[in-house]
């Protein structure tokens, strides 16, 4: 007890004064402590900003999977590290918020609330004391001769003043007692809670990095191995450069050059056998380079100027050179026309152009371009040029053109002439009449042929493909659905302009925390679909990501994609709580009925002991409730009938088809249904009502009818997509089809997000071997296709027709460069 006696005495007044002085000293201490706490939280905030800045810099440095420079130095590996560092930064921001909420705010509340109330109570007490003293003195100064009515009035004023005085005195006593009582627990609780927040911060950081420890060690081992390989390669390169320099010196000393350059003797008998062996290996599919090097080529224009070009003579008898060998290609002049199995020279549309650049180094190719120059089968070679005063020259004469070339020295001239002569002889000896006619018809006009280099100095396979003019793309791009696709993109852009927290707080129930009712929640659980406060978010994190994936509405900006926002807008805290807390409100009625029917007390569910907390309740109460709600699921109305489990899949199937995300969510939570079950394995064990079967048949017939009507209205624009439309409809009712397949065909992106959040296999295949990504491309649902690719969808998955998704994309009107890049990224 702070006051042994409540009588107004000098001892009582002295005790109150002592407690007021103590409260004032405590106020000063609290203010100093608050300044330190504020400086600490500001430091944590600056630390978080520095962490995010470092992560952003690392992400910018690491680049992406499509950047070959970043891939070369391990950019994708660094991206994995940035995810962990960003998560640690989020932990630090949570720590800052908790320190500010549990310590700084409570200190400020104590100073501005409790201690300030003591001062206000003292002022009211002093004022009441003066009034009471004046009334008492006035009453005591009355004479015996004073009239009774005047004395009664003064006495009544005295009683009123004393009542006010006592109320002010006891109010001051209450304020002092409250401040004195809080000293015993308020600060201990705040500081210990802050230390617990630090414990959770370091524990979460340790666990996250501990999980990454094997990967970090693996990367370090790989880096060490790469360092050793690089050192070995550098030593090998230095040795090769020294050997090359010695060879150049020997060739320079040993070259015999006549004064006019006419002393050459081109005897090819020594190398003829070697050339024939190499030419025979080309018939077996092995292409080798016989000779390569720089030659000066005389232009065929009026000026007849000389240009230095890099020539290659290969084992197929092809002689070609590189234009502008080490310059950047400008404009579209060097754009390749060779499309490896994907696009032809005249294929229109963005897709064919992009695929060409993808296989040959970019639309604006920065590599040299090889030009086919001459058909050696019908050519002869002569020494010297037309003018006899030039040295080291020789001519290649074909029926269509004469090429005048100049070597750098006599030895190179002799070697080129020997090699070309040997190749011509080999071509004449091995060429059949039929093959000769075919080559003449395809190559004699080869002066206009060009091919991009895709790795080495020349890619013989590309050149051979270009000669034969092969291409597998038969359907040019059309613009039938571009307006609808661009409209969808504009809608997504409008959503992106708003902040996620502004979009989601407009949903019913999202203005308060789903678990404790705290106003203005700014955290969320991605898979549960609820908005929660920062205090509950810490509890959710301790549940584990297999139960709740917690993200901030304001900090984790990249998480809030259109698919996630669509899912959250379809659910809301009110509906989600109706699923997870269905038995919470009805349990009181159930318990009353069980008591009236004589149900033993031990049989009552343990949920009677748990109540839903308020936002002012201690964190221990909230933690108990959240664990019971999500981990133990004691408020969920679960399905216990095994036959019910068999029927649930068919209900989920119909809900996905109808794009009813709420019903699908309820089935997943209440029945714990397997979202990866295949329709052929789950639905046929259930006999559906006749009305349901008739409804399904009517839906199927209506879809076929709409396809036929669309074809009749626009047969030309629909010629390429009719087969896809029919297969898409049939696919919905085919066997071995998962819920994700169906969602990609008939639902929106929010339904796909819901299934992915609950573990749907993104690369599951149906009876035709097609993944959901295949169906998205075929049905032109490009937004969902992009989502699947960003979540790990395999762009190289092959169906039973040996087609990958990009093959189907080449037959559609796809003009999204970002999606095309994801589809054609072979490193994914």
From Swiss-Prot:
- MF annotations from Gene Ontology: GTPase activator activity; zinc ion binding
Native species:
Arabidopsis thaliana
Every copy of the BAR domain together lies at 1-225
Q: Name one GO biological process term.
A: root hair cell tip growth
Q: Which residues carry this modification: Phosphoserine?
A: 441
Regions of biased composition (Low complexity) lie at 590-600
Stretch list, region Disordered: 247-268, 590-611
UniProt protein name = ADP-ribosylation factor GTPase-activating protein AGD1
Entry keyword annotation includes Repressor: no
ANK repeat locations: 735-764, 768-797
CDD domains with a match to the protein in the record? ArfGap, BAR_SFC_plant, PH_ACAP
Keyword Phosphoprotein attached:
yes
Which key words tag this protein in UniProt?
ANK repeat, Coiled coil, Endosome, GTPase activation, Metal-binding, Phosphoprotein, Repeat, Transport, Zinc, Zinc-finger
The record's account of tissue expression is: Expressed in roots, but not in hypocotyls or cotyledons. Low levels detected in leaf and shoot apical meristems and in siliques.
């Amino acid at each position: 007890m702070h006051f042994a006696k409540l009588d107004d005495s000098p001892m009582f007044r002295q005790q109150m004064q002592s407690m007021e002085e103590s409260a004032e000293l405590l106020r000063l201490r609290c203010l100093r402590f608050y300044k330190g706490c504020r400086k600490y939280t500001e430091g944590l905030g600056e630390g978080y900003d520095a962490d995010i800045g470092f992560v952003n810099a690392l992400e910018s440095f690491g680049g992406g999977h499509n950047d070959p420079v970043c891939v070369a130095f391990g950019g994708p590996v660094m991206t994995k590290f940035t995810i962990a560092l960003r998560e640690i930064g989020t932990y630090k921001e949570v720590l800052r918020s908790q320190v500010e909420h549990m310590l700084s705010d409570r200190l400020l509340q104590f100073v501005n609330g409790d201690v300030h109330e003591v001062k206000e109570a003292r002022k009211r007490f002093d004022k009441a004391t003066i009034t009471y003293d004046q009334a008492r003195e006035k009453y005591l100064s009355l004479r015996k001769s004073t009239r009774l009515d005047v004395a009664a009035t003064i006495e009544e004023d005295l009683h009123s003043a004393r009542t006010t005085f006592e109320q002010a005195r006891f109010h001051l006593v209450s304020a002092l007692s409250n401040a004195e009582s809080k000293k015993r627990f308020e600060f201990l609780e705040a500081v210990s809670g802050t230390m617990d927040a630090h414990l959770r911060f370091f524990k979460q950081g340790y666990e996250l990095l501990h999980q990454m420890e094997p990967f970090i060690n693996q990367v370090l081992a790989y880096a060490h191995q790469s360092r050793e390989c690089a050192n070995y390669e550098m030593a090998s390169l230095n040795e090769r450069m020294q050997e090359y320099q010695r060879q150049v010196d020997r060739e320079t000393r040993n070259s015999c050059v006549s004064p006019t350059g006419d002393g050459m003797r081109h005897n090819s008998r020594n190398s003829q056998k070697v050339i024939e062996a190499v030419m025979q290996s080309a018939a077996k599919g092995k292409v080798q380079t016989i000779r390569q090097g720089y030659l000066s080529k005389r232009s065929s224009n009026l000026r007849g100027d000389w240009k230095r070009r890099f020539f290659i003579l290969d084992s197929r008898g092809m002689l070609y050179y590189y234009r502008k060998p080490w310059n950047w290609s400008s404009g579209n002049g060097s754009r390749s026309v060779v499309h490896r199995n994907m696009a032809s020279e005249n294929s229109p549309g963005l897709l064919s152009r992009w695929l060409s650049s993808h296989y040959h180094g970019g639309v604006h190719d920065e590599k040299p371009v090889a030009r086919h120059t001459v058909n050696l089968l019908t050519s002869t070679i002569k020494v010297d040029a037309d003018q006899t005063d030039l040295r080291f020259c020789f001519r290649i004469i074909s029926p269509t053109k004469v090429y005048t070339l100049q070597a750098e020295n006599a030895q190179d001239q002799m070697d080129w002439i020997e090699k070309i002569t040997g190749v011509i002889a080999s071509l004449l000896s091995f060429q059949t009449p039929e093959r000769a006619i075919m080559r003449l018809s395809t190559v004699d006009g080869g002066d206009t042929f060009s091919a991009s280099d895709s790795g080495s100095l020349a890619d013989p396979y590309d050149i051979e493909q270009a000669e034969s003019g092969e291409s597998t793309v038969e359907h040019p791009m059309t613009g039938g659905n571009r307006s609808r696709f661009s409209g969808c993109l504009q809608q997504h852009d409008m959503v992106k302009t708003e902040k996620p927290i502004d979009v989601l707080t407009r949903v019913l129930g999202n203005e308060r925390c789903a678990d404790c009712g705290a106003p203005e929640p700014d955290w969320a659980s991605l898979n549960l679909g609820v908005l929660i406060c920062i205090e509950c978010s810490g509890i959710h994190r301790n549940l584990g990501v297999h139960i709740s994936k917690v993200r901030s509405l304001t900090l984790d900006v990249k998480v809030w994609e259109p698919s996630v926002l669509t899912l959250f807008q379809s659910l809301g805290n009110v509906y989600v709580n109706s699923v997870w807390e269905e038995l919470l409100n009805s349990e009181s009625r159930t318990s009353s009925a069980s008591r009236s029917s004589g149900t033993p007390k031990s049989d009552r569910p343990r949920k009677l002991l748990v109540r839903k907390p308020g936002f002012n309740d201690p964190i221990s109460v909230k933690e108990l409730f959240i664990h019971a709600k999500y981990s133990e699921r004691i408020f969920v109305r679960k399905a216990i009938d095994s036959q019910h489990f068999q029927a649930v899949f068919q209900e989920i199937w119909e809900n996905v088809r109808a794009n009813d995300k709420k019903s699908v969510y309820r089935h997943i939570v209440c029945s714990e249904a397997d979202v990866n079950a295949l329709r052929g394995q789950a639905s046929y064990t259930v006999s559906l009502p006749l009305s349901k079967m008739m409804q399904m048949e009517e839906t199927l017939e209506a879809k076929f009818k709409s396809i036929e009507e669309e074809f009749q209205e626009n047969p030309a624009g629909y010629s390429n997509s009719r087969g896809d439309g029919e297969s898409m409809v049939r696919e919905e009712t085919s066997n071995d089809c998962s819920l994700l397949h169906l969602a990609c065909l008939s639902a929106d992106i929010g339904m796909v997000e819901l299934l992915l959040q609950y573990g749907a296999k993104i690369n599951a295949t149906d009876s035709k071997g097609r993944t959901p990504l295949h169906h998205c491309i075929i049905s032109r649902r490009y937004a969902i296709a992009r989502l699947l690719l960003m979540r790990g969808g395999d762009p190289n998955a092959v169906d039973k027709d040996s087609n990958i998704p990009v093959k189907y994309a080449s037959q559609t009107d796809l003009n999204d460069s970002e999606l095309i890049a994801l589809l054609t990224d072979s490193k994914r």
